[in-house]
Amino acid sequence: LVLTFDNAARLAARIGETTITTEPLTIRQWVDVALTFDQATGRLRLAWRPVTAAADWRSTEATGLEAPAARTPSVLTIAAAGPASPLATFDGRIENLQFYPRALSADEISRSRAAQAPLADPLFAFDFARETTTSTLVDTGPNGLTGRLVNHPARGMRSSRWSGHEMCWRHAPGEYAAIHFHSDDMTDCGWPTALDWQVPADLKSGCYALRIEAGGETDNIPFFVPPPKGRPTAKIAVLVSTFTYTVYANHSRPEFRLSQRWRKGWLGQAAEWNAYPHNPGDHPEYALSTYNDHVDGAGISISSWHRPMLNVRIGYITYPFPDIRASGLRHYPADTHLHTWLEDQGYDFNIITDFELHHEGLDLLKDYTVVMTGSHPEYHTREMLDALEAYRDAGGRLMYLGGNGFYWKIALDPERDGIVEIRRGEGGIRAWAAEPGEYYNQFDGEYGGLWRRNGRPPQNLVGVG
């Protein structure tokens, strides 16, 4: 039994070879949907109504059908056709998902919707307003059939009962009981492990890259080695902006997609300079950055380093000639110039990253004489700013060597490292704007957006901004 959308924006219910459909639905409008199948009569019924006070239920049905053969074990998937691969994926919001071991009557369906609660005997009833910071779906029914989200769809989203009275999902969870699924959500490719390498205990702190070759092609995968925890090996620390790299990961610039001149210039310059040849604009299968949109037009709010990040590569250029008469480098490729200069000048330094700064705080910094940023330290958690301010106020020397720094507030997935969230709300230079009422992070429930709007402008930390 499958419920999906067709290309005409109609809901389609299918059992065996029989399909019934609704009328075309209005985009960005909440709709109540009830799908029932009565095994005794072979009746398949699909009912729907817009979620407005005056709307009536409409329905379509087919009769005389045979029940599908049971499959054991069975897996229910939401917003996709199957668990093994992302087939027939869904773009849109879902809330208040209930399943029953029998076909409900029209009256029971109406009563359940009016009460905003399941009836007494659900097989399971998911309340998406619970455990919002996690990937867990809570079943409020008697069977406790917990669900699991894959690839981090957006939570803490406005649902059908949103009134606008509360802007924070923690204060009115029933008004933020929706999950926004996107067909291009991806925080992990899910590839099997091809290589396992243990970093030697005596490897010098620094920036490294794994060079791989296959089928006549080569690639490089950068990684960073900090000193042993609690044992700095130099007086200089270079803070690598790994969270900023992740937020920008696979940024598909509009110029590359929309301008043939710009695209030709980028490809030509990459070839002429022997630069990294792959542009994220040609590879949306690896998921784009939080500076891009999902395929349904919603801004991408979650990014991950558990996937290829094509612009976090040695030799990747962002801007080609003649648009910019310079190196064309940003972020990681630009920051490597600082690392190389320090090495050439004979300075001993340690590499530390945003990850260690967030988790270790001031303890990470306190033994360094100076901490240097890279060229573009833009995205930070509260814990990171707290640590940098404490280091500075204790007499530490913080060298801000970049621009556009300490600008956006981010949240980290509490369940898994390497997954970052940004809500672009209420001000700032934004690639997209969060919807009203959706300015609070799903990962920690805090108000997101600019650090300036959280009372901590960059000028407070480094004097400029």
Identify the function of each model-found stretch:
Residues 206-212:
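Short, aromatic- and glycine-rich surface loops/edge beta-strands on solvent-exposed regions
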Residues 152-187, 214-364:
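Aromatic-Pro/Gly-enriched surface loop or interdomain linker
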Residues 1-159:
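Extracellular glycan-associated modules
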Residues 28-29, 204-206:
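A glycine-anchored, Pro-Gly-centered beta-turn/N-cap motif
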Residues 181-187, 196-198, 202-204, 324-414:
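Helical hinge/lid and interdomain linker segments adjacent to catalytic or ligand-binding clefts
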Residues 31-33, 193-197:
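Short strand-edge motifs at loop-to-beta-strand transitions and within beta-strands
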Residues 12-18, 183-191:
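Extracellular beta-rich ligand/substrate-recognition surface
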Residues 378, 382-465:
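A glycine-rich, often tryptophan-bearing local segment used as a flexible ligand/cofactor-contacting loop or short
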